[in-house]
UniProtKB/Swiss-Prot annotation:
One Pfam family per UniProt: RuvX
Molecular function GO terms recorded: nuclease activity
GO cellular component, one term: cytosol
Species classification: Bacteria, Pseudomonadati, Pseudomonadota, Gammaproteobacteria, Lysobacterales
Keyword terms: Cytoplasm, Hydrolase, Nuclease, Ribosome biogenesis
Family annotation (PANTHER family): POLYNUCLEOTIDYL TRANSFERASE, RIBONUCLEASE H-LIKE SUPERFAMILY PROTEIN
Domain of life: Bacteria
Function: Could be a nuclease involved in processing of the 5'-end of pre-16S rRNA.
Subcellular location(s) per record: Cytoplasm
Bridged cysteine pairs (disulfide): none
Protein name: Putative pre-16S rRNA nuclease
Length: 155
């Protein structure tokens, strides 16, 4: 399997905010203007909607994948972390790309604040709120772009 450091720093990455019902997806590149929310993928009883994920993968052809690592504020493990790590392993097996983890603490809060600002500016509507998961994924990608050395390898 590819190593964590194998993601080209100038390559395109897809980032994921993994939840129990939805997975936010964002794309980013160091050569572009940060990250952009691109999709919200539903998670069913038997796992994520792989058809939708395959479609996003084919559209963006990333060089690597960045999964949010949901640590608690005191660096403890939690069920959400096990889910995110399992999803990262599935991504690595399915797409044969390097997968890294990046601390996602407060990414959903930051995404909600961005959404509120964009809504106040008239750029978002209430019905766009379902895109919050994808906005959180964009925060995760931006964190990786800003400090790729802070990423950890998937166990």
């Amino acid at each position: 399997m590819p190593e964590a450091g194998a993601i080209r720093p100038d390559g395109t990455v897809l980032g994921f905010d993994v939840g129990s019902r939805r997975i936010g997806v964002a794309v980013g590149t160091a050569l572009g203007a940060g990250a952009r929310a691109v999709a919200v993928i539903n998670v069913h009883a038997n796992g994520p909607d792989w058809v939708a994920l395959d479609r996003v993968y084919k559209q963006w052809r990333p060089d690597g994948l960045v999964v949010g690592d949901p640590l608690t504020l005191d660096d403890k493990d939690q069920p959400a972390r096990k889910r995110a790590h399992a999803f990262g392993r599935q991504l690595r097996e399915r797409y044969a790309l390097p997968v890294v983890l990046i601390d996602e603490r407060s990414s959903s809060v930051e995404a909600a604040q961005r959404f509120a600002r964009e809504r106040a500016d008239g750029r978002k509507r209430r019905r766009d709120a379902e895109a919050l998961d994808a906005m959180a994924a964009a925060v995760i990608v931006e964190r990786w772009l800003a400090a790729p050395d802070q990423a950890t390898s998937l166990p």
